[in-house]
From Swiss-Prot:
Family, as annotated: In the N-terminal section; belongs to the methyltransferase superfamily. tRNA (mnm(5)s(2)U34)-methyltransferase family. In the C-terminal section; belongs to the DAO family.
Species of provenance: Paracidovorax citrulli (strain AAC00-1) (Acidovorax citrulli)
Task of the protein: Catalyzes the last two steps in the biosynthesis of 5-methylaminomethyl-2-thiouridine (mnm(5)s(2)U) at the wobble position (U34) in tRNA. Catalyzes the FAD-dependent demodification of cmnm(5)s(2)U34 to nm(5)s(2)U34, followed by the transfer of a methyl group from S-adenosyl-L-methionine to nm(5)s(2)U34, to form mnm(5)s(2)U34.
Name of the protein in question: tRNA 5-methylaminomethyl-2-thiouridine biosynthesis bifunctional protein MnmC
One example GO MF annotation: oxidoreductase activity, acting on the CH-NH group of donors
Tagged with keyword Transmembrane helix: no
Record lineage: Bacteria, Pseudomonadati, Pseudomonadota, Betaproteobacteria, Burkholderiales
Keyword annotations from UniProtKB, A to Z: Cytoplasm, FAD, Flavoprotein, Methyltransferase, Multifunctional enzyme, Oxidoreductase, S-adenosyl-L-methionine, Transferase, tRNA processing
Gene that produces this protein: mnmC
Enzymatic reactions: 5-aminomethyl-2-thiouridine(34) in tRNA + S-adenosyl-L-methionine = 5-methylaminomethyl-2-thiouridine(34) in tRNA + S-adenosyl-L-homocysteine + H(+)
GO biological process: methylation; tRNA wobble base modification
Region (tRNA (mnm(5)s(2)U34)-methyltransferase): 1-227
Record's subcellular location: Cytoplasm
One GO cellular component, as annotated: cytoplasm
Gene3D superfamilies listed in its UniProt record: D-Amino Acid Oxidase, subunit A, domain 2, FAD/NAD(P)-binding domain, Vaccinia Virus protein VP39
Amino acid sequence: MSEPIDWLPDGTPFNPRFGDRYHSHTGLAQAREVFLRGCGLPGAWAGQAMWRVLETGFGCGLNFLATWAAWRADPARPRLLHFVSCEAFPVSADDLLRSMQGHGELEPLARALHAQYWGLLPGVHRLAFEGGQVLLTLYIGDAQAMLRQQQPVADAVYLDGFSPQVNPELWDVHTLKAVARCCRRGTRLATWSVAGAVREGLAQCGFRVQKVPGLPPKRSNLQAEFDPAWEPRPVQPELPDVRVAGGPSSVLVIGGGLSGAAVAASLARRGWQVRVLDQGAEPAAGASGLPAGVFAPHVSPDDSLLSRLSRCGVRATLQALEASGLSEGEDWSACGVLEHEVDGKHRLPPAWAGDAAVGAEWSRPADAAALEAAGLPGATVAYWHARGGWLRPARLVRALLAHPGIHWQGRSAVARLEPVAAPGGATHWQAYGSDGTVLAEAPHVVVAAGYGSRPWLPARYPIHPLRGQVSWGTRADSPAAAWPPFPVNGHGNLVPHAGTAGGGIWVMGSTFERGQTELPPAPQEQAQAHAANAAKLEQLLPALAQGLAPAIAGPGAAPGHWAAVRCTAPDRLPFVGPVDAARQAGLWVCAAMGARGLTLSQLCGELLAARMMGEPLPVEVRLARALSTERLPAD
């Protein structure tokens, strides 16, 4: 449930829980005076590659929108603006948009924020704007707890929230200590509150504080700088600090599929010069060449780690698709996905059961209309994933690789990687082809070649092959089939309609053949795969299976076939991070997506880039830890 708010006669939003307004009718002017000017912005970020703002109370997003507008208007702006904001009680997207009606210049930005402001369950949510150059990371939960957990580094701090009289926990010394732990020496802080307890708390935490004249009707504001008289004790992070020295440079990415393209795009947006070495004659020649596939969140009664990761992944995938320039309906669609629990077990968290429940914007019990559209009985156990959909991964790969900072180099199978001495005492990596020629050289290499990543990873990386075969055909060849209007997953999955050529294609599968690497599969194995896929469809969508049977197993049937080898780890989670930071500096990995590459690859690319650049993480730190290479035992 979103936080209910009231509206005062002057049109400003008011929170009945705290008995305080979010901002006054002069809110935009106050935001600029108190927070931007108080932190020396936009001047302070001039010439910087990245700027990180931390805010303690998001409210209706006014300070974020004002900062974004200042970034857009500044020709000396940083390439990347991070805005991290805490919010325990998020308002609805519609109320957020309504609150900006008096600030016309912000309304286009507010509409963009409104479009992404959904599904804000407790935890961390990354929203992306301006092609990924403005990143809003929302910490939904208690500010003190979230800051202690995430430990983002801030260049500027907006200390904001409801009055200390009505919300003292947000201003107490414990929260201020959590804020201070996120500051570097020289970080500037600004707030509208001049309460004595706030001034004393900031001073106690190492800030030099001064009271300055305010913009009427405010008499005074506070400005501060983190400059403790002591040397701050280093915080022990949950994840090791592996940021690269010197900022963006050049990097080689081995692999031209979804993982490699996601990493390449994330780094290129940050100013890296990226060269993708791909053994294929064209991008996405391996497992990412799937004709079409489903992306959807995972659900579990305890809202497991994988469930939380998958939601972050779906959000990142949608952001990539929306920014890609691809055609919705032809190349992808966020049409929703029906999940049929063929074993009849209930897997949705109990608190998510109602339409108004906290998780309903993500997943909820399927209604009668959805079940009827899929040809399933009304008593079927099934869920509707409102933010799921389908995509044609090869087209997304090509769109990602089109960034001007990326050079794709095909027919470039890497046979050997070697560290070499570079000028200035640095170490570079050289990639050699099978004939011994140097394909490319760079200070950093990211291995993102799926199962082909094995030669570059130590033996302690337990990755295994997982061959998958799908069946596909054109809708025109099966006019009698009872097609659902949306993808369905569960035991296998079906994309009923992808693209428009020839009426569109359908795709179903996939097999999970552990240990199998032979490509293409033998004819007998292909026939067995078609039979296995048809058997899954019989359980998943019995009505459709009956109508589609002639195209799969009827006389003269010749269903389309596609196969590839995926890569998976024993815990079914990808590896994202340095391969061996102590002994192989500059070598990174982003691989082992398993069967969830469409859902997780974009998130993993952003996570790797964030770790390489020392940025706020796009996920909860415990989720990042679960994906990290540091989870592996040392040699």
